[in-house]
């Protein structure tokens, strides 16, 4: 079926199971927002007072739900205002996809009104960033962005979409998105070595990180700590992997420690 680039963005979001996006509209993103209104029965848009707030809200949503957070903004300051949110998600390994508007492709690189090279600006604080210059490439780029955000060490990915790309039409074919790969034990022998080390430890202590929470393994981790009767200290990202009032929990350590 023939769809505009803006409609393709919405269809790709639905493919990925997205039901909530955070953002702040502007001129270069109006086509996308017009399409988003047509999809409002399936995709909820939460308007924030500032783009930075939208990026942090998408980050928090991803942490709370385990889903990939999505933030939408316009070009120029709309795009640069989300850099701090992207950096936060990058450092903490939070899956996030940012979709930004930009000036039309014929105006790129001409110092146009509210034009910045956001793709290169965010490279140090994202897993990847893409500029889509043809509507035919849009769907595959968004799908790739979600795959990158969700696979391996999770993190933010930015897709920059010029205004004419969101207005142009092309054929769209729905696909079943690739699901994140499950973890595999690739070296059972090393696991057995670790088991022996834990078994023979005289005073074992566990330093727990955020991977436990992102893997939704808090209950299993608590059972493991109780089984070997080891006190648990946490990194900043690991806080919450075991209840703070649990007898084995000794809280955070280091300069941010509370014990």
Regions found by a protein language model. Name each.
Residues 1-259:
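N-terminal alpha/beta PP-like core and its mobile active-site loop of ThDP/TPP-dependent enzymes
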């Amino acid at each position: 079926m023939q769809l505009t680039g803006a409609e393709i963005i919405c269809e790709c979001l639905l493919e990925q199971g997205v039901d909530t996006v955070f953002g702040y509209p502007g001129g270069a993103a109006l086509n996308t927002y017009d399409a988003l209104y047509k999809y409002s029965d399936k995709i909820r848009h939460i308007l924030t007072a500032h783009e930075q707030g939208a990026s942090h809200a998408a980050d928090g949503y991803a942490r709370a739900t385990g889903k990939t957070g999505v933030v939408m903004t316009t070009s120029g300051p709309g795009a640069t205002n989300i850099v701090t949110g992207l950096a936060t998600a990058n450092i903490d390994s939070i899956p996030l996809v940012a979709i930004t508007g930009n000036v039309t492709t014929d105006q790129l690189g001409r110092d146009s009104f509210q034009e910045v090279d956001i793709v290169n600006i965010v490279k140090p604080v994202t897993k990847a960033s893409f500029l889509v210059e043809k509507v035919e490439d849009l769907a595959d780029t968004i799908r790739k962005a979600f795959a990158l955000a969700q696979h391996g060490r999770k993190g933010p990915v930015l897709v920059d979409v010029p205004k004419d790309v969101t207005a142009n039409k092309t054929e769209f074919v729905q696909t079943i998105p690739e699901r994140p790969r499950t973890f595999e034990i690739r070296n059972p022998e090393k696991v057995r070595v670790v088991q022996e080390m834990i078994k023979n430890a005289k005073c074992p202590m566990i330093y727990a990180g955020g991977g436990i929470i992102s893997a939704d393994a808090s209950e299993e981790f608590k059972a493991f700590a109780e089984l070997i009767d080891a006190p648990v200290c946490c990194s900043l990202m690991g806080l919450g992997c075991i209840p703070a009032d649990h007898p084995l929990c000794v809280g955070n350590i280091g300069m941010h420690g509370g014990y």
